[in-house]
Amino acid sequence: MSESASMLQGSKRGTDSSVDVGGAKRTKVDMDDGSSSNNDEKELLEATKADELDEVVDDYAEQNDHSAQEVAGEYVPKKPEQPIMLTKDSNSGKYVFPPISKEDSLNARYFLKYHGSAQFLDSYLPEDLNSLYVFHLIKLLGFQLKDRELLTAVQKAVQNDVTSGVSSVVGTNPMVERVSPPQLSASTPSGDGYDDPLEKKHAVRLIKDLQKAMNKVLSTRIRLANFFTLDHFISKLKSAKKVLVLTGAGISTSLGIPDFRSSKGFYSQVTNLGLDDPQDVFNLDIFMENPSVFYTIAEKILPPEHKFSPLHSFIKMIQDKGKLLRNYTQNIDNLESYAGIFKENIVQCHGSFATASCVTCHLKMPGERIFQQIKDREIPLCAYCYPKRQEEYPTVSDDPGTKNGQQSSHNSSSIFHMSRSFGVIKPDITFFGEALPLEFHTNIRQDVLQCDLLICIGTSLKVAPVSEIVNMVPAHVPQVLINRDPVKHAEFDLTLLGLCDDVAAFIAQKCGWDIPHENWPQLKQRNIQYDELERGMYYVYDPVKEQAKDTGQRQVQAP
């Protein structure tokens, strides 16, 4: 057995030794002590860092045989008929990796989570192996290494293109032969007869990378194998009793309210404020230093009064069907209340414009009372604190305006900072640096355990802790994303790309339900279509809008 195989066998023996990190299992390599070769291997393992891994499971070619076993609606991964076996090209003498399909990769990931590390390694790896088996197993789990030196070394030993997610064979010669890994003779002293296609440092790196890949699979959610089509979603939505809906800025853009992170979003519009980070507009420390930074641009995100989108009404429809467990919204526009969603069914994770409070005396008032001042780009002041503000800080301007045509700097003395924010009324929006509302923490723990369907709409899931809700929901609960762009750092079972209102109308049409919105009669008549982009991902669109968009783009591009 080669030394790389020996080191991996040590890893296989030690898979039951683990540490608990935030509820996730991390496997450790259990090396034998006593021999100099094992000590050398241990030092090499400790000195070698794991590579950066890219998840490429979605890049694998899809095979739609759907022969996976389903028992009581739960996917049971298949045990491989035999461990991985590499072949060799008869002409080049290079190893040939077997092809990997997306189905193969998903089954391997599910097998690891279902049966654990020890049984996974025993089932997928032969007793005699070399480092190339480890490389192939990493790819089978859906990961691609980024270390160029390591990839170059592997490429020299194999016929396949190792830089892509798909194990496509380079060259045209189909003649291959099954081979066993190189072996060390019994008389060969351990440590002196290293015989492996890769150098020992590369073999050690691969072992580290395999452990890292396995740890990531064990600690993250894997998509359900029996929930990936529109029909699956429609059927589940009809039968669900406790739907958890997580919404973001994308559900309000049809009303003219900008999102935050797109090229035309809010953050791209505030680059002229001289901030190191556009998100500092919502930084509590900066607001207390200079509230004019926020009030100069607050009108851009001020919600329209008593208006709401068809998507808001789509959530109301789910509520009216008795299916809505809770709507966790990251939006601050409070449009859910205008749509008729009950207060007890809404958690405004980042606060809202619904109310406002004095930062000094904490007097609370309806947010609408300061809307006109926000529109006029004035800093709203508390009537109770205003006399003291005038007495203590008579020279402080109450305008968010400018000095010599330039935006006022928020880098001033601490006394000036205190005076600028004294008695200022702030919308009850959760700024960066503030705790989330108590109702979030009160409800989320029980809601994630009770829900039977999670729908995330119009969000990029970039802001914690709300973004972690997808990882808190039990793994067997289907997760659906409705958004303009895919969210690659989460494992949604079904992704519906498109405009939120169009997707909502399409789903309502398929369910035979009516959305309680004034535009529903027109939306109901639209011939909304879809294209399947890949397994579990669809593009939903209105052909009329698409044609108009294409025409507009051609007109812009015309000389």
Curated annotation (Swiss-Prot):
Its cofactor is Zn(2+). Binds 1 zinc ion per subunit. Residues 39-51 have a biased composition (Basic and acidic residues). One of its GO terms (molecular function) is histone H4K16 deacetylase activity, NAD-dependent. Residues 223-514 form the Deacetylase sirtuin-type domain. The keyword Hydrolase does not apply. Its main location: nucleus. Residues 52-62 have a biased composition (Acidic residues). The active site is at residue 350. GO terms for cellular component: nucleus; Set3 complex. NAD-dependent deacetylase. Heterochromatin component that silences transcription at silent mating loci, telomeres and the ribosomal DNA, and that also suppresses recombination in the rDNA and extends replicative life span. It acts as a NAD-dependent histone deacetylase, which deacetylates 'Lys-9' and 'Lys-14' of Histone H3 and 'Lys-16' of Histone H4. Belongs to the sirtuin family. Class I subfamily. This is NAD-dependent histone deacetylase SIR2. It comes from Eremothecium gossypii (strain ATCC 10895 / CBS 109.51 / FGSC 9923 / NRRL Y-1056) (Yeast). The gene is SIR2.
